[in-house]
């Protein structure tokens, strides 16, 4: 991204090392970006602090006994994890490390089970707190709180879609069932998972009530997760090194991409690409709905060959003038863009979440592609449903914000 932007500026006779350096620094000199390392830290604490096991045990106590029960455990756990870290890769790794071996040992289809867990993992980029939505909000100048609140209903629709699809796939399957737990056992499992379950509620209520900003929400989440993990005796001093190293690695990658994208956005702007794009698209259609449909199809293709965060940083500056020309709500579009590109995380050949699942299950990408196909289909339907009925997002987003 940095190289291509530099080449473009050179071609435009605007290559200047001081200008490039200034834009690079400006790319990270943004207060809301501080939320990213804290949410990354929350995910690492959850991974190393024993929180994952408590959440999965609670979900198992509730639905593990029904046919295909471990699939429902994965879906419920994915929803809860989504409200904790905001990272699809972290959530998929945490879920998969426990559930994939368990499901395979219970005679569940390996490819389909891994596909479900990967599909559940990407809910974390839609449900608040979402790291890609923070990136989008900063790039587009949209309210991050509004984006967070607007992602709630689509995220729940994705959960319902996975639930119905899994029910159809496993309606006649005789997999090993977990023992139905008693009310007392469920209560014990709930008590053990209570404090982690409280974190998503704290974040949503805090943002909705104006108690803290999205950046402060990241700090609250990290401190809260740390206190809970220490109280559970899951996070020890020996594990802190791994927690901080993991946080530093992922944060530095995201920040470098964000800084490089600022140079790319500058090059795209001075080349007048957005202006040309507006004029071209206006000749195709006058309908905002048809325009959204065309853009969503385009972004689906982009998601197959490019990771989510670079795609957001590259294409938002290009598409923003088009959205304004058609009076499309930029917060609504941001939610749609994140949902769309998140599908690319579980689509070959670049799908990073799919490779996480492959690494855990030891299955090839070809086999996983077949296993995840039904869930991709459902996600595509949900996305198009929101394109043609934007009120599904806009009404609750405005109310919750």
Curated annotation (Swiss-Prot):
GO terms for cellular component: plasma membrane. It is found in: Cell inner membrane. InterPro entries: DctM, TRAP_DctM. GO terms for molecular function: carbohydrate transmembrane transporter activity. It is a multi-pass membrane protein. It holds the Pfam family DctM. Its main location: membrane. The keyword Cell membrane applies. It comes from the Bacteria. The chain crosses the membrane at residues 31-51, 70-90, 115-135, 144-164, 193-213, 217-237, 253-273, 290-310, 330-350, 353-373, 375-395. Keywords: Cell inner membrane, Cell membrane, Membrane, Transmembrane, Transmembrane helix, Transport. Belongs to the TRAP transporter large permease family. This is Putative TRAP transporter large permease protein HI_0050. The lineage of its organism: Bacteria, Pseudomonadati, Pseudomonadota, Gammaproteobacteria, Pasteurellales.
């Amino acid at each position: 991204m940095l190289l291509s932007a530099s080449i473009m500026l050179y071609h435009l006779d605007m290559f200047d090392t001081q200008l490039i350096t200034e834009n690079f620094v400006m790319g990270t000199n943004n207060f809301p970006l501080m939320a990213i390392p804290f949410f990354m830290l929350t995910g690492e604490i959850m991974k190393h602090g024993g929180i994952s096991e408590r959440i999965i045990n609670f979900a198992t106590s509730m639905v593990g006994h029904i046919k295909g029960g471990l699939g429902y455990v994965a879906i419920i756990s994915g929803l809860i994890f989504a409200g904790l870290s905001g990272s699809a890769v972290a959530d998929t790794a945490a879920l998969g490390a426990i559930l994939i071996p368990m499901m395979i040992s219970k005679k569940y289809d390996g490819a389909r089970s891994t596909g479900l867990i990967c599909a559940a993992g990407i809910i974390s980029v839609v449900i608040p707190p979402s790291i890609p939505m923070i990136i989008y909000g900063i790039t587009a100048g949209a309210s991050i709180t509004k984006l967070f609140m607007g992602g709630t209903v689509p995220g729940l629709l994705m959960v319902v879609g996975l639930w119905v699809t899994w029910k159809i796939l496993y309606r006649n399957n005789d997999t090993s069932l977990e023992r139905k737990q008693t009310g007392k056992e469920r209560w014990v499992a709930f008590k053990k998972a209570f404090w982690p379950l409280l974190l998503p509620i704290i974040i949503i209520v805090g943002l909705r009530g104006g108690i803290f900003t999205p950046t402060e929400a990241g700090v609250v989440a990290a401190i809260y997760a740390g206190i809970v993990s220490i109280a559970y005796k899951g996070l020890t001093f020996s594990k802190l090194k791994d927690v901080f190293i993991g946080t530093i690695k992922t944060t530095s990658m995201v920040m470098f991409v964000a800084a490089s994208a600022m140079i790319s956005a500058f090059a795209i702007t001075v080349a007048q690409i957005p202006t040309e794009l507006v004029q071209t698209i206006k000749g195709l259609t006058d309908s905002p709905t048809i325009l959204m449909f065309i853009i969503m199809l385009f972004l689906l293709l982009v998601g197959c060959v490019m990771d989510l965060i670079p795609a957001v940083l590259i294409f938002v500056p290009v598409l923003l003038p088009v959205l304004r020309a058609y009076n499309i709500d930029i917060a609504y579009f941001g939610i749609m863009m994140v949902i769309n590109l998140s599908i690319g995380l579980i689509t070959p050949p670049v799908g990073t979440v799919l490779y996480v699942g492959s690494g855990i299950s030891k299955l090839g990408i070809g086999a996983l592609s077949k296993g995840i196909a039904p869930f991709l289909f459902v996600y595509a339907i949900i996305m198009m449903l929101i394109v043609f009925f934007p009120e599904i997002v806009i009404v609750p987003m405005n109310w919750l914000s």
